[in-house]
Amino acid sequence: MAKQNTHLEHLEDDILNQGSRGGFNAIKFLNELGVMLSEPRSSMRVTTKWDGAPAIICGKHPETGDFFVGTKGVFAKLPKICMNDGDVDVLYSGELANKLKDCLKYLSKLPIKGVLQGDLLYTNDKVIRKVGDQQSITFQPNTITYAVPKDTDLGKKIAKSKLGIVFHTSYSGGPELRDMIPSFGVDVSKMQNVPGVTVFSSDFNVKDATMFTPQDMTRYKSAIKKAEGSLKQASKFLDILKTSGEGKFMLAPMFKIYFNTYIRQGKTFPSADAVTRGFTDFYTQALDKEIALKKQESTKKKYIKMKEDGLKFIKQNSKPIYMTVASYMNLTAAKTIVIRQLERVKGIGTYIRTDNGFRVTAPEGFVAIRSGNALKLVDRLEFSRANFTVEKNWG
């Protein structure tokens, strides 16, 4: 069964998800992105990652041919599929239910073949406000606020529409929804003249991007070489890491949670050495918290032993853990060079809402697609931190 596009992973997280294979994959992606930004022969595709919510899956049901909508729950073992308002009332509630009813009403008008996945951008929650020195139509589906000048062609189109969505993934095959095969990228050119709906494209036109200068390319190749060097030393340990630990205290997922604590707190990584030392404290605190929750003495002993074994493993593998942290940081550094280059392309205005008004920000990020596989390119400190703190408009 194919894996649906329910969650894309960050490029640097691939070493924690797939071990040494993930490191090899991340380097392949980075090298191909370098080709894409320096010469016209790249097979790499890039899409813009819109900060829409909720995720919407819709189209013709592969078994019945009837139009349906739903969230990512359509791929569950007990799929939550809505073919009419009654289904929505049974399966959903609140503002999400209202938005899904709008999706049924308006997306069913689109010439959709098969099944598409996208992100909802707005329904009845558009707001006209002054952003900078222009009156703009704004919508905030999740963390980022999008702003389009009111008097432009796109602004007028959005003003007339009842719903806005961006599609990024198509599905084909069957016989059931969960058996369908995803393909990244959707041609939305034939969906542009349907009354009441504005369909945005996620495609990123690389021709609009500023190419790397020779100096840029030298700096970028140096960043990749640095990542390759640390990965070479971390490679064997990354494969051990995937199978180390027990239950929710498997070490690879714990490293992901640990790295994310820096982002939640709005902190950049200090040195690789400091991050490595900090993981011991993080692991200790997580196990101590779990031990304190246990009532039975036998269960407490189990987790006390797990903690002791884990700390012993961490101490014995301090150097490979250091190289793992260094690899993560080096991959992030190389990825950031690409992000900054892609961000130079001007698109729809993107802002973060603050207590003092709106602050200009970059798009959420990009998705790099290579040989049917996709990884996220996101400035996590900028976007993900805001994602944890900015109040959302739907629930």
Regions from the PLM with identified roles:
Residues A2-M44, K49-P54, C58-G395:
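Core nucleotide-handling region used for phosphoryl-transfer chemistry
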